[in-house]
């Protein structure tokens, strides 16, 4: 079984929430032992049978939520080769807000506080994953007529309406979500680790386990509370967040032209605007 629908990201655009919601839907088949397989960008050498083994459901709509793929041309080529008929879903978020969230993603993993520009130099994906026009164009060209856009803002303002949009682009019945499907499904909030060293070691260990095929182990450890222990508990981030929101405006030359081009080309195609 291969995906009928792939949410290609980018990261920090509500994809964890989407994966969690879709797992409440019996008619949807997702990877059984992990959220994201990283097959198309990090594990393609393992082969298609290995990838298919993650989808163990009986029938239904097969979906992977894989936000790491959006800004990676090689991953796009791999998706095109293996799943040429898949529906591709791109999540749109204000690129400046997305960079701020991505900054705190690295802070949460134990990276030291630094200016946004320096963080972006060390981690180029902070900017690359916010270039919505550049990479949406690539996906549109590779999958003509198969790409949908969904607004992250709708998730924050109207979760039930957001679920309806997700049902539409996924091709599953749009039913009123039960209360327990939305309870506790808050959008990921920024946090800092109680120990940068512990967060760093935990992240590296998880990456190594995934490379060795230990997705199930990583998923089990998440359920034990290790993720919360390693990546949170470090105090209030509000002051740093305010500074980062101001600092990110320095990236206007890199982000604004692409945003203008995206709005002009795809703005009317976004679900939830």
Sequence positions of predicted segments:
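Anion-recognition interface
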Residues: 1-273
């Amino acid at each position: 079984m291969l995906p009928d629908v792939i949410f290609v990201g980018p990261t920090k655009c509500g994809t964890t929430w989407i994966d969690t919601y879709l797992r409440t839907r019996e008619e949807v088949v997702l990877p059984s032992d992990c959220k994201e397989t990283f097959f198309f960008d990090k594990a393609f050498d393992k082969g298609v049978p290995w990838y298919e083994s993650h989808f163990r459901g009986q029938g239904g709509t097969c979906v992977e939520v894989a936000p790491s793929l959006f800004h990676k041309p090689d991953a796009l080529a791999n998706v095109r080769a293996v799943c040429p008929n898949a529906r591709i879903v791109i999540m749109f978020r204000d690129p400046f807000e997305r960079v701020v969230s991505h900054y705190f993603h690295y802070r949460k993993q134990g990276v030291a506080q630094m200016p946004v520009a320096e963080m972006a130099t060390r981690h180029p994906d902070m900017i690359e994953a916010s270039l919505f026009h550049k990479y949406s164009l690539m996906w549109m060209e590779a999958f003509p007529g198969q790409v949908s856009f969904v607004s992250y803002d709708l998730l924050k303002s109207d979760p039930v309406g957001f679920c309806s949009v997700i049902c539409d682009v996924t091709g599953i019945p749009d039913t009123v979500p039960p209360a327990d499907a939305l309870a506790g499904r808050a959008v990921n909030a920024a946090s800092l680790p109680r120990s940068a060293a512990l967060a760093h070691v935990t992240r590296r260990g998880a990456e190594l386990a995934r490379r060795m095929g230990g997705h199930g182990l990583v998923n089990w450890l998440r359920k034990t509370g290790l993720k919360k222990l390693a990546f949170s508990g470090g105090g209030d981030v509000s002051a740093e967040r305010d500074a980062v929101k101001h600092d990110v405006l320095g990236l206007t030359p890199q982000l604004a032209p692409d945003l203008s081009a995206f709005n002009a080309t795809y703005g009317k195609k976004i679900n939830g605007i």
